[in-house]
A protein has these predicted regions:
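Intrinsically disordered, low-complexity N-terminal segments that are enriched in acidic
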Residues: 1-135
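Hydrophobic/aromatic-rich core segments of domains that either
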Residues: 49-77, 84, 186-192, 239-270
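Hydrophobic transmembrane alpha-helix bundles
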Residues: 87-98, 161-164, 248-260
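The feature marks a conserved, polyanion-engaging helical scaffold used by nucleic-acid processing enzymes
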Residues: 98-208
């Protein structure tokens, strides 16, 4: 709990921290030992975690999660949905074999893990320079911002979840604020009207990042957080929607909503 407060960790960050911790401290121990220690630590932090075994006696860590996540097997048990994780594997790894629960007196205790990133974790530094270039109204623009590679690496461990979670999340906000400040400087320098300023930010969102579909670029469909969109070489319409939404809020204070059509996701601004 002290580390969670010190590093300003969200629930998911805390889960990854526990996974990393047990694999480091108990590196030479059996998978069963690591799994039991991870469950004990997660329960100590107030989360609803349980132990289970596969048919082949492989130990699994089960954690109850508040929101739905995808491409991940789960079991509904005692009015809670538990997603299956292996303590020594990437969090996105999926498991399909039948599992068997082991009951203990405190199985019903604890709270569900919240996947929304309500705050920006205090890890790493914004030290990866990224050049962003775009055109607007016949003129070329560019800015150099510094992204947090460690934060992006943490986000890369995030399982596929509903798009709304990415829209609600506040991770990566220092980078968004830096971009917002640079855009506002140009808006004031060019004395753009309100309508032209909105179009200017829209043009930035469309042209500052190289377009490609997730399937072509990465082999699977995956929403991204703002930091990932800016750091990764390619992004699609869904990935661009996340930083765009936060930019409109930061710069203009406008309400925004994503519109999810089959194969496309635009952003509506009020």
């Amino acid at each position: 709990l002290k580390a969670k407060a010190q590093y300003n960790l969200n629930d998911w960050d805390s889960f990854v921290m526990i996974q990393t911790l047990v694999n480091t401290i108990y590196a030479k121990e059996a998978k069963l030992t690591k799994t039991l220690h991870a469950i004990d630590l997660l329960r100590g932090m107030g989360y609803k975690a349980r132990f289970a075994e596969g048919e082949d006696k492989t130990p699994y860590l089960l954690i109850s999660i508040k929101q739905q996540i995808y491409s991940k097997s789960f079991y509904d048990k005692d009015v809670s949905r538990f997603y299956i994780f292996a303590v020594d594997a990437h969090p996105r790894a999926n498991y399909t074999q039948p599992i068997y629960f082991f009951n203990s007196p405190d199985d019903g205790m604890g709270r569900q893990l919240d996947m929304v990133m309500h705050k920006n974790p205090n890890i790493g530094k914004n030290d990866s320079p990224i050049k962003l270039s775009w055109d607007f109204d016949g003129k070329q623009y560019q800015m150099i911002v510094k992204a947090n590679g460690e934060l992006a690496a943490l986000m890369d461990m995030y399982p596929q979840a509903d798009y709304g979670i990415y829209m609600q999340s506040r991770s990566g906000m220092p980078l968004i604020s830096e971009i917002s400040s640079s855009l506002m400087v140009e808006i004031k320098k060019n004395n753009f009207s309100k309508e032209k300023a909105v179009a200017f930010v829209l043009r930035f969102s469309q042209k500052a990042f190289t377009y490609n579909t997730d399937f072509d670029a990465y082999g699977f469909e995956m929403p991204f957080f703002a930091e990932q969109t800016i750091l990764l070489p390619y992004s699609d319409c869904e990935a661009r929607t996340t930083p765009s939404l936060h930019l409109y809020i930061e710069i203009f204070g406008y309400d925004s909503v994503e519109l999810h059509y089959p194969g496309h996701m635009p952003l509506a601004v009020a």
